[in-house]
Every structure is written in structure tokens, then in C-alpha cells.
Amino acid sequence: MGKVAVAGAVDYSDVSALTSVLESEQVDTVISMLPIDNDESGQAQLNLIEAAEKSTCTKRFLPSEFGMVYTKDPCPFLPMEAQAVDALEKTNLEFSLVSIGLFLDYWAAPRIPTHIRAANIIIDPENNAAVIPGDGNTPVVFTHSPVVFTHSTDTAKYTVALLDIPNWKRRYAIVTNRMTLNEAVKLAEEVKGVKFDVKYLSVEQMRKGENDLTPSMKKALPEEMHSGMKSMLALSGIGMAAGSNDIREIDDLVVKFPNIKPVTVRDVWEAWK
């Protein structure tokens, strides 16, 4: 394995400076963990890709995808991911895309430590409630979120393991848990010994903006941010109800590396007992 780094305090607007950092550190593989949630962060990753292509020592690149299987058609609200893939396809860099489904942290926090800002979405174990997009019967994949440098969470562990694969395929999956939302609620009720208050949202309701937040999310966010969060969750919920978060027929790193023991949904609910 060559030298691997995750870029930290650098100027992502300066491609030349980024290239210099990669070359001075002799970085073979770049793992981008930038939070791609707006045009600025999307451009930062594009600049990092350009710098990696210009670097004389950088050969491989993992873009900050780590979610569902993003495609241009179902996810017009996430154009930055498509732009990164388009940019990588024009380079000589070897690259791969890693799909993990949803971050399990959004159910686990704060009972299981996380380095991302997480409040309970969809299922709220703190308040024994759930706001489920669709009928809750579409399989959804969950995985624990990455913590860069410490490798203390599942996605980080599997990503590091991926670096030992000499020739990457275009896409890999990390499927640590695969179940429907109804199955997840049923398991939570079984483990906690309480009945959850479950609200279902149809696709029509979500398209009209008639979405709702879990009690924990309402408490975590200022009231002026509720509307924006509802809109964002409605968009993702529509895709989820259609099965966009289900991951199948992709090389699964969980199968390739059975020595890694991931956090399960049951582990999360046990933490809330």
C-alpha cells in the first residue's frame, strides 16, 4: 500500500497548493471525506480531484460518496456526486465508489459515540416514535458512520481494508444491516419492550411537503430550520420509498472482510434500553 492521507486544513480553492501537499506527502491514495452538501463543498472536491490528477505520485481516489447508489436520474438534488464521477472519469486516476446506505449514527447517537452531528431521523428510539416514508416495507441498508484517522467505526474500517485490494472495481458496497423500516421498528419494540408511535407518510404527502420530523429532530433543530429539514427528508424519503436505499448485486466489503465485526441495528437498540 502506498502512503494514504485524508486532507485536513488545506485551501481547497487552490489547486496548485493542493497538488503541492499531495506531492510533498507522497500521497498515493486520496480518500475524500468532505461533507458534500452545497456548491462550495462540491467544487472543493472537484479541485481535489484535479490536484490528484496533476500530482506525480497520486494514483487512486475515493470520492466522498458513502451513501446510497447515487445516479443522475433519481437524485437530481445531489448533482455534486454526479459531477465528481464525471470529473474522475476524465482523469487517469483509479477510482471507486463506496455505497453504504444510511448512517446508523442517526439512530445510535448519542448512546453510541459518533463524530458527526446526528439527531434521530425516521426512527426516534429516545422518544419511542417513528416517521416512516412510504409503507415501511422497502428494504433499507444501514451502516455505522466513518471517523477518519481513528478508524473506530465500520465504514472507516472497511474503507481502509479496501485499500489493500490491488485493482478496484468501479463500485463497492458496505452492507452491514439490510432490513425494512417496519422490521427495524419491530426490533426496537422487541428490544426496548415498548410500543412505538409510528406515523407513515405517503409519497403524495411528501411531494406536497406534508412531511414531519421526529421529536428528537424537532428538539435538536431551531424552529426556523424545521421547514428546510422537512423538505430535505421528503426528497430522500421519496427515493427511499422507491427503494433507492436498497443495495444489492454490488461487491460487498462485509463479505470480503469477515474479520471485521460491524455494529448491528440490534446493538443500537440495546444501547437505548
Please report, for each region that a protein language model flagged, where it lies by residue.
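Terminal hydrophobic/aromatic helix or amphipathic segment near a protein terminus
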Residues: 185-244
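Short beta-strand elements of ligand-binding domains
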Residues: 59-65
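Generic structural signal for helix capping and beta-alpha/helix-loop junctions
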Residues: 39, 70-71, 105, 206-208
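Oxidoreductase cofactor-interface core, primarily capturing Rossmann-like NAD(P)-dependent enzymes
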Residues: 1-3, 8, 15, 68-197, ...
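Amphipathic terminal alpha-helices
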Residues: 248-273
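NAD(P)H-binding glycine-rich loop region in Rossmannoid oxidoreductase-like domains
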Residues: 9-58, 70
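Short, amphipathic alpha-helical "lid/cap" segments that border enzyme active or binding sites
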Residues: 19, 152-160, 262-270
